């Protein structure tokens, strides 16, 4: 574990730290720690997936990162500034979160109303709101949905409106908390593309707490939680080629890697791949 951390520090030595989590512990009942002395860094413009089984602590850490929970021990820094739980301004202005079920984020009659609500809370000048909402809606391709009743939207459309609401406030860090879990396959695929675009085109730092092993392959780095502690961190290619670790931690394989493994059992050798296009390209070149 220490070796993983040192390697990550060396690879990112010239990048600013977006989050520094230092020796954080948390307990809901003040007896049993859900997070136990957790430390890790996340760098600016990095896409990090946090994974682990139910009860591992991954959803709790997301709530600590956005200030919904106050750790009983440890410190949290964002872009070098220690977060005071008496003043959340620096945290609130730099971090946005999209939850598993976006319904709780909708309060207006239309999608546009819901996006505007977040801007009103930030006391944004009403004269520029329409331009901000339009720009945010273009990023996630929902301009045609702005005047529609939020309750009539599909799950995938609601998630895109929720993302637009976050983007409108222009945070540097965006956290997705199990955001693909309630979506159909098409919705999941659309959301995964948006996550990549936010990192690659909008230069956001993206953190995804997820059970979706196929999404994890898109990340720059994976952090694995178990029983309130980090047991492994590394690139997807490092994590998912370590079959001994996957077996010992009872983690599932992404579908595309299961398929690659099955091909190898049929004497069709392929390299590590993160999507079906890469896999098909390798297979076609072998013919």
UniProtKB/Swiss-Prot annotation:
Gene3D superfamilies: P-loop containing nucleotide triphosphate hydrolases. It is found in: Cell membrane. One of its GO terms (molecular function) is ATP binding. Its main location: membrane. GO terms for cellular component: ATP-binding cassette (ABC) transporter complex. It is a peripheral membrane protein. Residues 19-252 form the ABC transporter domain. InterPro entries: AAA+_ATPase, ABC_transporter-like_ATP-bd, ABC_transporter-like_CS, ABC_transpr_CbiO/EcfA_su, ECF_ABC_transporter_ATP-bd, EcfA_1, P-loop_NTPase. Forms a stable energy-coupling factor (ECF) transporter complex composed of 2 membrane-embedded substrate-binding proteins (S component), 2 ATP-binding proteins (A component) and 2 transmembrane proteins (T component). PANTHER family: ENERGY-COUPLING FACTOR TRANSPORTER ATP-BINDING PROTEIN ECFA1 (PTHR43553:SF24), HEAVY METAL TRANSPORTER (PTHR43553). ATP-binding (A) component of a common energy-coupling factor (ECF) ABC-transporter complex. Unlike classic ABC transporters this ECF transporter provides the energy necessary to transport a number of different substrates. Belongs to the ABC transporter superfamily. Energy-coupling factor EcfA family. This is Energy-coupling factor transporter ATP-binding protein EcfA. It comes from Malacoplasma penetrans (strain HF-2) (Mycoplasma penetrans). The lineage of its organism: Bacteria, Bacillati, Mycoplasmatota, Mycoplasmoidales, Mycoplasmoidaceae.
């Amino acid at each position: 574990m220490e070796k993983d951390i040192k390697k990550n520090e060396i690879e990112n030595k010239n990048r600013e730290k977006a989050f520094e989590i230092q020796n954080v512990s948390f307990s809901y009942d003040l007896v049993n720690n859900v997070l136990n002395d957790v430390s890790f860094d996340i760098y600016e413009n990095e896409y990090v997936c946090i994974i682990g089984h139910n009860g591992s602590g991954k959803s709790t850490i997301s709530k600590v990162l956005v200030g919904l929970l106050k750790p009983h021990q440890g410190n949290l820094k964002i872009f070098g500034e220690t977060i005071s739980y008496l003043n959340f301004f620096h945290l609130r202005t730099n971090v946005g979160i999209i939850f598993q079920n976006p319904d709780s984020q909708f309060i207006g009659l239309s999608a546009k109303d819901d996006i505007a609500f977040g801007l009103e809370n930030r006391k944004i000048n009403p004269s520029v709101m329409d331009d901000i909402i339009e720009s945010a809606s273009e990023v996630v391709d929902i301009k045609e949905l702005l005047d529609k009743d939020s309750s009539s939207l599909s799950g995938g459309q609601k998630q895109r409106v929720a993302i637009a609401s976050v983007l409108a406030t222009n945070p540097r860090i965006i956290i997705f908390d199990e955001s693909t879990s309630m979506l159909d396959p098409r919705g999941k695929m659309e959301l995964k593309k948006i996550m990549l675009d936010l990192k690659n085109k909008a230069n956001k730092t993206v953190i995804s707490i997820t059970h979706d092993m196929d999404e994890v392959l898109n990340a720059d780095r994976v952090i694995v939680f178990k029983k309130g502690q980090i047991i492994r961190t590394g690139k997807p290619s490092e994590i998912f080629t370590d079959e001994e670790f996957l077996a010992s931690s009872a983690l599932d394989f992404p579908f595309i890697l299961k398929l690659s493994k099955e091909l190898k059992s049929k004497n069709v050798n392929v390299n590590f791949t993160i999507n079906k296009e890469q896999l098909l390209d390798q297979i076609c070149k072998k013919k």
